[in-house]
């Protein structure tokens, strides 16, 4: 019995290790070497072979440089801490995007065209200035997670209820929601795990803002 348990343990351990290895070496195409580019200039030297781009520094500007939208094979795009005020409407040229991270910018709205990113699974817009999402967010049928903590986001578009059975997590922590605001969101997304800051603390904080 002890011998059988040992074998079972080894099989489970091997399966977990194999899955972890597969997850960390996920490739998006035959020319994908797993590289994450950190320079737009370098990525543009071979635009059809760029699947991951992470930018944390951009020259002072309000929106993304137009050349970025030549990277039509992108699956993962991170533009973090670049002080962007606007997300270009051309974002829908990146039709294969599965992961979009716009953390720590100054975005006040998202364009309606974001709803055309039909393959998007993860949307990160934390630490911006968003007050709501565009109605077109309901078109993102493969979206499983929205990270929007620390935005002045108190209202969700009614259309988002279409994602009730697919959107697993909506992170709204560090947003001073009142009880009625939270309940309205939960009514739209009863099957979604909505993460939020303690409502009582939020109400107190907004009274003093």
Each model region followed by its residue ranges:
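Conserved hydrophobic beta-strand positions in leucine-rich repeat
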Residues: 51-56, 77-79, 97-102, 120-125, ...
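The feature encodes a structural signal of leucine-rich repeats
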Residues: 41, 64-66, 87-90, 110-113, ...
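Leucine-rich solenoid repeat scaffolds
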Residues: 154-209
């Amino acid at each position: 019995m002890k011998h059988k348990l040992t074998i079972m343990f080894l099989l489970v351990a091997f399966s977990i290790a194999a899955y972890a290895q597969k997850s960390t070496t996920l490739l998006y195409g035959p020319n994908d070497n797993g590289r994450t580019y950190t320079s737009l200039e370098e990525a543009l030297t071979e635009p059809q072979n760029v699947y991951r781009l992470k930018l944390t520094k951009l020259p002072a500007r309000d929106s993304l440089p137009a050349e970025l939208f030549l990277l039509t094979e992108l699956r993962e795009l991170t533009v973090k801490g670049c002080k962007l005020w606007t997300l270009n409407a051309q974002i829908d040229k990146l039709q294969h995007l599965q992961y979009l991270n716009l953390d720590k910018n100054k975005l006040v709205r998202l364009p309606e065209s974001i709803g055309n990113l039909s393959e998007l699974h993860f949307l990160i817009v934390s630490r911006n200035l968003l007050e709501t999402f565009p109605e077109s967010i309901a078109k993102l049928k493969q979206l499983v997670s929205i990270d929007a903590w620390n935005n002045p986001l108190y209202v969700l578009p009614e259309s988002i209820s279409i994602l009730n059975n697919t959107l697993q997590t909506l992170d709204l922590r560090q947003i001073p929601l009142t009880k009625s605001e939270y309940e309205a969101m939960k009514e739209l997304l009863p099957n979604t795990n909505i993460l939020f800051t303690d409502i009582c603390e939020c109400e107190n904080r907004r009274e003093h803002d």
